[in-house]
């Protein structure tokens, strides 16, 4: 059997192959993992896709991902449970008569590759020293983790920005207790943004700015009180002077008794 005969025998197999899926990637947010891909060029409309994951050196079918349609994705959250383990996945296009080559994803490490979402932030006012409370978000993937607070949401970078001029400073906070933000200008608006901070995962999303006004400076009432007291004192002195002066006038116009009117005046 010549080489051309062998080539002709294998030609139908080559022609019957489906285009392999492209752009295979694992998207992870707060330990919720999803495998996505695009159909290969000229993939038939009746094509289904099947997903396998690598477990202990063997490929196994992912539950719920055996007959996916175009533009569907595969949920790997229940499959990639251990954040300290590394995983791979592959997808294959299938019809009733054809199959494609399998397309592999990149090596995935949940601990370092997942995107950490923003924490839950609350700011309660206490004058010029607002209280900041930071708690981890909730998700199906984080609930499966052994200790999401200790792993991912233990420390945070808090940026405090004054809206009037854009000046800002940063501080470290934890999720175990409330933090007092001190040394703020009275009567100014400040916005607080909190981002998860870990030494092993650089992928994180900051929270939305939480803005609040500090209390204005209390008015100094001492000068006002002193002014009122001075005015009142002057009024009292003025009234006393008027009373005394009026008494003297009355005494000057009052007629003398007859016994005194007969007494000659000095120099008279």
Swiss-Prot record:
Coiled coil: none
PROSITE patterns: FN3
Bilayer-spanning residue ranges: 224-244
Endpoints of the signal sequence: 1-16
Oligomer and partners: Heterodimer with IFNAR1; forming the receptor for type I interferon.
Protein name listed in UniProt: Interferon alpha/beta receptor 2
Cytoplasmic face of the membrane: 245-268
Function: Together with IFNAR1, forms the heterodimeric receptor for type I interferons (including interferons alpha, beta, epsilon, omega and kappa). Type I interferon binding activates the JAK-STAT signaling cascade, resulting in transcriptional activation or repression of interferon-regulated genes that encode the effectors of the interferon response. Mechanistically, type I interferon-binding brings the IFNAR1 and IFNAR2 subunits into close proximity with one another, driving their associated Janus kinases (JAKs) (TYK2 bound to IFNAR1 and JAK1 bound to IFNAR2) to cross-phosphorylate one another.
Keywords: Cell membrane, Cytoplasm, Disulfide bond, Membrane, Receptor, Signal, Transmembrane, Transmembrane helix
An annotated Gene Ontology molecular function: type I interferon receptor activity
GO cellular-component term (any): cytoplasm
Induction: In the fibroblastic RTG-2 cell line, induced by polyinosine-polycytidylic acid (poly(I:C)), a synthetic analog of dsRNA, that binds TLR3.
Record bears the keyword Signal: yes
Pfam families: Interfer-bind, Tissue_fac
Residue ranges, Extracellular side: 17-223
Annotated disulfide bonds: 65-74, 191-211
Domain Fibronectin type-III: residue ranges: 18-114, 115-217
Family: Belongs to the type II cytokine receptor family.
Gene expressing this chain: ifnar2
Gene Ontology BP terms: type I interferon-mediated signaling pathway
């Amino acid at each position: 059997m010549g080489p051309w005969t062998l080539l002709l025998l294998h030609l139908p197999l080559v022609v019957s192959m489906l285009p392999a899926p492209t752009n295979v990637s694992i998207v992870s947010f707060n330990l919720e993992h999803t495998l996505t891909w695009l159909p290969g060029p000229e993939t038939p409309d009746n094509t289904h896709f099947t997903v396998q994951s690598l477990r202990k050196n063997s490929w196994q079918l992912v539950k719920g991902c055996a007959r996916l349609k175009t533009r569907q994705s595969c949920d790997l959250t229940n499959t990639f449970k251990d954040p300290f383990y590394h995983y791979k996945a592959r997808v294959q296009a299938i019809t009733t008569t054809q199959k494609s080559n399998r397309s592999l994803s990149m090596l995935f490490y949940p601990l370092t590759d997942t995107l950490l979402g923003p924490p839950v932030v609350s700011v309660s006012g206490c004058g010029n020293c607002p209280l900041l409370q930071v708690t981890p978000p909730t998700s199906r993937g984080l609930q499966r983790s052994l200790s999401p607070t200790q792993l991912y949401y233990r420390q945070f970078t808090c940026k405090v920005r004054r809206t009037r001029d854009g000046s800002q400073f940063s501080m470290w906070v934890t999720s175990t207790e409330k933090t007092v933000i001190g040394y703020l200008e009275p009567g100014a608006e400040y916005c607080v943004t909190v981002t998860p901070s870990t030494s092993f995962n650089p992928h994180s999303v900051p929270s939305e700015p939480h803005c609040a006004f500090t209390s204005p400076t209390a008015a100094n009432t001492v000068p006002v009180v002193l002014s009122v007291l001075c005015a009142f004192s002057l009024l009292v002195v003025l009234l006393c002077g008027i009373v005394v002066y009026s008494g003297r006038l009355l005494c000057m116009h009052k007629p003398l008794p007859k016994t005194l009117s007969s007494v000659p005046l000095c120099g008279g």
